[in-house]
Amino acid sequence: MKITIVSGARPNFMKIAPLCRAIDAAREAGKNISYRIVYTGAQDDTTLDASLFSDLAMRKPDAYLGISGRDHSQVAAAIMLAFEQELNEHPARVVLVVDDMTATMSCAIVAKKRGLKVAHVIAGTRSFDMNMPREVNRTIVDAISDYLFTAGMVANRNLNQEGMIPEYIHYVGNILIDTIRYNRHRLVQPLWFSSLGLRKGGYLLLTLNRHDLLEKKAVLGSLMQTLAGKAGDMPIVAPVHPYVERAIKSLGLDMPRL
C-alpha cells in the first residue's frame, strides 16, 4: 500500500514523524507498505532547519510543491494544481493529511476527487467559529475523510454529532505525545535558563500563532493585559515568530516580565 503524507508547515512534521517511524517498522516486519512525504512549501523554507528531521528521526520530504502566500484562495488553488501533478507522477492509494491548514484541505480535496482514500490525523477538532479559516478547513476535511483519527473523546463526540460514519472514527490519542516521549531523553535545561533569571516551576510559557487573533489589536491587547496581571512577578517566556513579536510590541504595553 502506497501512502502520500502531506505536510503544510513545520509543526505538521512533529505529528508525522511517529507515523513515519511506525510505517518503517511495519515495512521492516514484512508489510507491503510505503510512504512518500510531500511538503507544500519550498525546499529553502527557513523554518525547516537542518536539525529538524534528524531530531525527529525521519527523512526529509520526498517532494516540495513550492507554494507560499497569504491569500487563502490563491494558495489553495496553487496547492491543488501542484498536488494533482504530484499524484500523477507518484500515484498513491491513501493520502494522509494533518491538522487544519489550507494545505490540509487542498490536498484532501484533490485526493477525494481522484477516488483515493483520505486519512485525517487530529480530526474532529472544533472551535464552532466558522469565521476562522481553519475551522472551515477542518470541517471540509473531516466531511470527506475515510479515516478520522482523533486525539480525544470530545473530537469523537463532535464527529458523531455531525453525522460521520462511526466506523470511520478512530480514537488514537494525541500523537504529539509520541514525539515528546521519543525525545524525552533530549529534554534538558537550556544554557540560557539561568541567564534569564528563571527557576524550575517559576515561570510561564507563552506561544501565539493565530493570525486572526494577532490582527485584532483590541482582543490581543486584552489578552496580554490579563496575562500580565495574572502572572504578577512571574516571568513569561515567549518563543514566538518575529511577526508575533511585532504584533505584541505594537500594542505599546508595559510588560517588563515578558
Where are these regions (language model features)?
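A nucleotide-sugar donor-handling region in carbohydrate enzymes
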Residues: 42-47, 66, 144-217
